[in-house]
Design a protein with these regions (language model features):
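Short, flexible beta-strand-to-coil junctions
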Residues: 1, 6-11, 45, 52-56
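Short secondary-structure boundary micro-motifs
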Residues: 8, 32-36
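N-terminal acidic leader/helix
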Residues: 2-28
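Short, mixed-charge low-complexity intrinsically disordered segments
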Residues: 35-70
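Short, surface-exposed linear segments at secondary-structure transitions and domain or protein termini
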Residues: 22-33, 66-70
Length: 70
């Protein structure tokens, strides 16, 4: 496990995952095929960064957010 920080476009940390197990990037097409309900709920078509911790998957549009690991 490792720590991951989700950063907004200003570089501010909006979420920290202390028990992150995986980070991946899904293209907009992959998101539409695999997780259309997430795009509907968030309301934003974009490539997404997906973090996985003990609570499950967390989705953040890459147009707005970035991720840093440590």
């Amino acid at each position: 496990m490792f720590t991951a920080w989700i950063l907004n476009s200003a570089g501010d940390t909006v979420r920290q995952f202390d028990d992150c197990m995986n980070i991946s990037v899904l293209t907009e097409n992959q998101m539409q095929e695999q997780f259309p309900e997430i795009i509907d709920a968030i309301g934003f078509c974009s490539d997404y960064v997906v973090t996985v911790d003990s609570q499950g998957r967390h989705f953040y549009p890459l147009y707005i957010y970035s991720v840093s690991i440590g």
